[in-house]
Amino acid sequence: MSTVEEMAQFVLLWDLVHGVVLNGEEDRIIWKFTADGLYTTKSAYEIQFRCSYCSFKPGYLWSAYAEPKHRFFSWLLVQEKILTADKLQARNWPCNPMCLLCKIAPESASHICLQCPYAQHVWELVQSWSHDLVRKPDANSTIEDWWTDSLQSMPKEQRRTKAAILIYTVWNLWNERNRRTFQGKEAEPLMVLQLIKEEIGLRLRACGKPCVP
């Protein structure tokens, strides 16, 4: 042991094993991921991929009347896997930690889309334009809960339309964030609403959906 850290680790290990009393029984290997302690390939597979799948039901997202790139972005967003400042900092990448939309709070996926005063203003405009089909989100909700709660208990056609509006709204909030980050340009919430309407209009003309009420 050549360093103070190694000595500290040795002392910690000693404390852990010093109080262990052996009972004379033969040691045996126990697999803690099954009830009987026996290893199975099925349990190993489930453990390996347990965190690889989204915990929400993505069917509402993939069936939305939106383009594939918008749906894929939203799939990452709902799992909070987009590269916001909090994620960049966790990777030790240099960045401005503050939200560039409001400039008053740290940036995260949930903040940009739900909590930011700028985003809340955009949602208010979208709510008015959609005749309350889409409502301003609860700032205390998680993205996953917001997405799931927003699309429950409604007819399939209406749900696919509403999901599209949600997707195009968060997509344009993210684009506004990127304009400010990489181009130094800022747009008012009304302009973001106009961009949302334009993208939905392009999709409607190309595919016949979604039809906003």
Residue ranges and their predicted role:
Residues 1-213:
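A helix-boundary/hinge signal
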